Amino acid sequence: MLDIAIIGCGVIGAAAAYELSHYPLQTAIFEAENDVADCTTKANSAILHAGYDPEPGTRMARLNVEGSALAKEICARLDVPYLQCGSLVLALSPAELAHLQKLYENGLANGVPGIRLLSAEETRAMEPGLSPEVAG
C-alpha cells in the first residue's frame, strides 16, 4: 500500500521523491513520459529564482531564497554539477532604472546573497555586447 503518490517526475516531482525517501514511507512516482524531466522541466530556463522580485515578507520571497540555497545543497550532496553564474536584469530607461532600484531593495530585504546594483558602465564591462542604451 502506498503512502504517497507523486504525479510527474520533473524537477519538482523528483525533488519531492528525494526528500520523502528520508522517511519510512512507501512512495511511488507516476510519470506519463518515457523518461524523467521530459516535459516542462526539459523546456525551462534553468534559472533558480533568487528572490529579488517578490515583495519582502511574503512567503514567495522566503521560499525563493530558501529554495535557491536548498537546490545548491542538494546538488552538492548528490554530486550534481551546479554553476551559480548569476543574472543581469537590465534597464533601458529612467523608469526601468527606478524599477531596478526597487528590485535591488527587495533583494536586500529578502536576504538575497550577492545582490548588486550595477552602473551602466559596470554592466557593459561585464557584457560588452549590450546596447549602449543600457542604463544599468
Question: Residue locations for each model-derived region?
Answer:
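N-terminal Rossmann-like FAD-binding beta1-loop-alpha1 element of flavoenzymes
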Residues: 2-29
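Short N-terminal amphipathic alpha-helix/helix-capping patch enriched in small hydrophobics
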Residues: 16, 32, 44, 64-67
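Glycine-rich FAD pyrophosphate-binding loop
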Residues: 21-43
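Dinucleotide-binding Rossmann-like beta1-alpha1 core, especially the glycine-rich loop
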Residues: 46-126
